[in-house]
């Protein structure tokens, strides 16, 4: 707006989670959106890349990573600070940031870690707070709260900090799965995103390998009963008043919606999803209720299953920093709802300033 001081956006991306590359792709989209003509009078952007070792690189280098001038930059010569320094908030690069926009998918970012760090700057951030972020990242805690709020979910089991090197423990877990769930089942680490560490298990012989795969990421393991379902997603933005996007559906070619399906396949995206208006409204209501239950605001993507045989709505999970890649559903949902990506990022900043 003419005469109004431009807001400086601090875009944080990369990180040392296993979703590092996804974060870079998301940041490229958001960076480009802020640089678009429609946003030039309102915003400037400073990018801050965190490499896989946890080192923060300065904004000049970080911007070149986003524009493609530099690839796989790993030197520490241009860092603002590293893990041994604690006075990083005094750095001149941080002083002029008006709003932070973290795009760190996965642990040490999306789990509330970066939100806690940003709190020390006393500047607003795009997204929800520490508690909502932590709960949204932890599948076990999330599902426990959903259960307490009587929100519909698939049947599931939880195993926490079990010693998989102990044969008796392994047998106990397998027996409980056989007793309480029906195949196929999905074995998931509690703290992970983008379907990393998840396995679809079709019979007893596949359980152990799936448990070990999930255990390698997180010793807290969630096991869900697999059903014949449609993958449905809903975007959320807002603070005290949450607004829902159009409902979308993902049709994927693979056996299930795994990492490759999300980022490397030619999935068919249907927006709005071809479902009954009554079901659509119920999904939107549950999406808002689920975010309220976890104290999630700002923006999020809520994922659902719609059982094919019964049209039963089943809440899957909430993603508090959804992807902004070219294949990501969140920006597509909002574009179908009337907000192009350039308008969406500006709207998210406005929401953060309204808190």
Swiss-Prot record:
| Biological process according to GO | cell wall organization; peptidoglycan biosynthetic process; regulation of cell shape
Q: Where Mg(2+) 1 is bound, by residue?
A: 303, 317
> Could you list the residue ranges that cross the membrane?
none
Q: Which Gene3D superfamilies match?
A: 3.40.50.20, ATP-grasp fold, A domain, ATP-grasp fold, B domain
Q: Which domain of life is it from?
A: Bacteria
- Identify the residues that bind Mg(2+) 2: 317, 319
Keyword DNA damage assigned = no
A Pfam match: Dala_Dala_lig_C
NCBIfam families of this UniProt entry?
D_ala_D_alaTIGR, PRK01966.1-4
Q: Which family does it belong to?
A: Belongs to the D-alanine--D-alanine ligase family.
Protein name per UniProt: D-alanine--D-alanine ligase
The coding gene here is ddl
């Amino acid at each position: 707006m003419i005469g109004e001081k431009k807001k400086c956006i601090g875009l944080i991306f990369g990180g040392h989670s296993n979703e590092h590359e996804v974060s870079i792709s998301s940041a490229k989209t958001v960076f480009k959106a802020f640089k678009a003509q429609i946003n030039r009078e309102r915003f400037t952007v400073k990018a801050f890349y965190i490499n896989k070792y946890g080192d923060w690189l300065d904004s000049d280098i970080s911007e070149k990573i986003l524009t493609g001038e530099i690839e796989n930059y790993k030197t520490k010569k241009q860092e603002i600070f590293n893990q041994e320094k604690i006075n990083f908030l005094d750095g001149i690069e941080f002083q002029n940031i008006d709003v932070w926009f973290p795009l760190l998918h996965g642990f040490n970012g999306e789990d509330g870690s970066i939100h806690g760090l940003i709190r020390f700057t006393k500047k607003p951030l795009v997204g929800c707070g520490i508690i909502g972020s932590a709960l949204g990242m932890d599948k076990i805690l999330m599902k426990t709260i959903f259960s307490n709020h009587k929100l519909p979910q698939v049947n599931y089991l939880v195993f926490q900090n079990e010693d998989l090197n102990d044969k008796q423990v392994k047998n106990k877990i397998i027996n409980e799965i056989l007793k309480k769930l029906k195949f196929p089942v999905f074995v998931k680490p509690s703290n992970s995103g983008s379907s990393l560490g998840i396995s679809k298990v079709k019979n007893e012989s596949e359980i152990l390998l799936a448990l070990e795969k999930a255990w390698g990421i997180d010793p807290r393991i969630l096991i869900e009963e697999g059903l014949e379902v449609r993958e449905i997603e809903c975007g959320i933005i807002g603070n005290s008043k949450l607004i829902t996007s159009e409902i979308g559906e993902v049709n994927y070619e693979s056996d299930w919606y795994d990492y490759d399906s999300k980022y490397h396949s030619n999935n068919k995206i249907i927006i709005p999803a071809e479902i009954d208006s009554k079901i659509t409204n119920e999904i939107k209501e549950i999406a808002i209720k689920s975010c309220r239950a976890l104290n999630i605001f700002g923006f999020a993507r809520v994922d659902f299953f719609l059982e094919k045989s019964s049209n039963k709505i089943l809440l899957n999970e909430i993603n508090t920093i959804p992807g902004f890649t070219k294949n990501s559903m969140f920006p597509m949902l909002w574009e179908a709802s009337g907000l192009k990506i350039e308008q969406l990022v500006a709207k998210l900043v406005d929401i953060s300033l309204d808190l």
